[in-house]
């Protein structure tokens, strides 16, 4: 009975209260950041993506939550911009190409360098290991170990293994993001 009441209350709140959140999506080039944005916005996977030059901003509405998503280029010349776009956001989404093991060390270093910035302290981080559909891609446990995520103690950190191409775990990723739009307001 209580569950039914809570669902009814959530439905009622959704009619009158809209939630907004701001996210920044960063990670090395070719990890699938822009593809991820397109998949959550339209449900469509496009094989022919052009690397982001600088940044893109997109607003996506899911239920009563509007997500303002900053997609920042991952090439070395754009990485100095990451901190600026991560300040004050609801969460940082860090994309990793889980199938490109040669870049895992560089990806780990960039993530830890970013999170060492004082102005980003306490902002939750969602690490997404993309391209799990490719044989040999790291799973969540391997990503946590290779990215040294257990060393990050000053904030909430979560890691999912996803495939934008197959839309694997996109639903739980969205649930995590929406949950964090609610937790930032309270």
UniProtKB/Swiss-Prot annotation:
Pfam families: Arf (PF00025). Belongs to the small GTPase superfamily. Arf family. This is ADP-ribosylation factor-like protein 8A. Transmembrane segments: none annotated. It is found in: Late endosome membrane; Lysosome membrane. The keyword Transferase does not apply. May play a role in lysosomes motility. Alternatively, may play a role in chromosome segregation. Residues 1-19 dip into the membrane without crossing it. It comes from the Eukaryota. The keyword Nucleotide-binding applies. Disulfide bonds: none annotated. One of its GO terms (cellular component) is lysosomal membrane.
């Amino acid at each position: 009975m209580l569950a039914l009441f809570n669902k009814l209350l959530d439905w009622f709140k959704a009619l009158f209260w809209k939630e907004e959140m701001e996210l920044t999506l960063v990670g090395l080039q070719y990890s699938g950041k822009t593809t991820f944005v397109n998949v959550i916005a339209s449900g469509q996977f496009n094989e022919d993506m052009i690397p982001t030059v600088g940044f893109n901003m997109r607003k996506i509405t899911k239920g009563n939550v509007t997500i303002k998503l900053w997609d920042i280029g991952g090439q070395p010349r754009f990485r100095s911009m990451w901190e600026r776009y991560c300040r004050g956001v609801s969460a940082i989404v860090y994309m990793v190409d889980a199938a490109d093991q040669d870049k895992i060390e560089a990806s780990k270093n960039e993530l830890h360098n970013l999170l060492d910035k004082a102005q980003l302290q306490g902002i939750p981080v969602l690490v997404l290991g993309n391209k799990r559909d490719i044989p040999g891609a790291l799973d969540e446990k391997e990503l946590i170990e290779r990215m040294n995520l257990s060393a990050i103690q000053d904030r909430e950190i979560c890691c999912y293994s996803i495939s934008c191409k197959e839309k694997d775990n996109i639903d739980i990723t969205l649930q995590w993001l929406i949950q964090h739009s609610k937790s930032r307001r309270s």
